[in-house]
Amino acid sequence: MRSRALGFFLAAFLAIPAVILGCIGCGKPVPTDAVGTGVADDQTLKNLAAVELNGQGATFVKPILDVWKEKFIEKTDGKVKINYTGTGSGAGVTQMTKKLADFGCSDNPMTSKQMAELPAGAEVVHIPLVVGAVVPAYNLPGVSEPLKFTGPLLVEIFTGKIAKWNDAKIAALNPGIALPDLAIQPVFRADPSGTTFIFCDYLAKVDENFKKTVGVSNAPAWPKGVGIAQSKSDGVAGHISRTEGAIGYIELTFALESKDKMKYGSVKNKAGKDVIADLDSITAAADASLEQKQTQEPYSLHQLAYNLTDASGEKSYPIAGMSFAVLYKKQDGAKGKAVVAFLRWATSAEGQTLAKRRNYAPLPESLRAKIGARLDTIE
């Protein structure tokens, strides 16, 4: 009798979790894409209407956009096609504001001047997509070990004050490396560029005169007669690869994925450490910056816009930045639902895992939660 009673008790006890789990589905279903999680439910994606989205902008983020758009076609059973053209951050924002693109991508947030030019009553939303790094990439034959740079040294190189690779200031930072007696050719972006903005933002923080003369902009006033300008990240990377003595600033992915495995150097950070750009050092910069209140325009003008340059912490890479999707808060019908679903998926764990494979640092989980909530505000 006792054994039968005990058996009944155990059976009833073990059934309790199943009853509880079954009741979770009672009444209103619990969504797999909960508010603020930044996770896109597969069935929701398959139920999207057939549309074609057009995006333009930052070349910084183009390598992962190319991956995301192909994967998203699969996720939506071929219903949502995404076209993305790397025209540069400036052009991407302009085309989006003119409604010639469904979304723009930019490595720098919209400025107060750009915001003032929006149609009356219009609002825009900035959605962080990935965290990346701008690296000083160079072509220096016979030098295999990564060179060490500081912010002030990069200022002197890119303003033409240091003209030879065997200059005493470069040699002092790189003892034991046989530097060639070769002219330095700085390579800049010819088009309005978020990569340029990130690079200049960092240089302006370490050199007040650079801020006053060259400025912090996606199209700064580089000194005349110094270096050469090339369009887009591909153009800069290509010129560096072809030109001995060249040095330019490009997103890390372009250096790592170049055919000739382009060399790039470390940069001394705020803590005085020589740091090479990699996923860990980029993540460290993001984590440190997310803790800081954003008081500098244009970052202070927008929710979820964070400045990552010259971040604190011994492990932080100092020339890190975010790339943002920029879109109108008020969206139209099926296209609006599709672009929000795409951004929600791109910033999900799945989308960020794909980004990591292309050498971008995943967005911090705390930020992804805020992104989900921000996407919920798009009408």
Where are these regions (language model features)?
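Bacterial N-terminal signal peptides that target proteins for export
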Residues: 1-13
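Residue-level signal for mature regions of secreted extracellular proteins and peptides
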Residues: 16-19
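C-terminal motif of bacterial Sec signal peptides marking the signal peptidase cleavage site
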Residues: 21-25
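Flexible loop/hinge segments at secondary-structure junctions
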Residues: 26-379
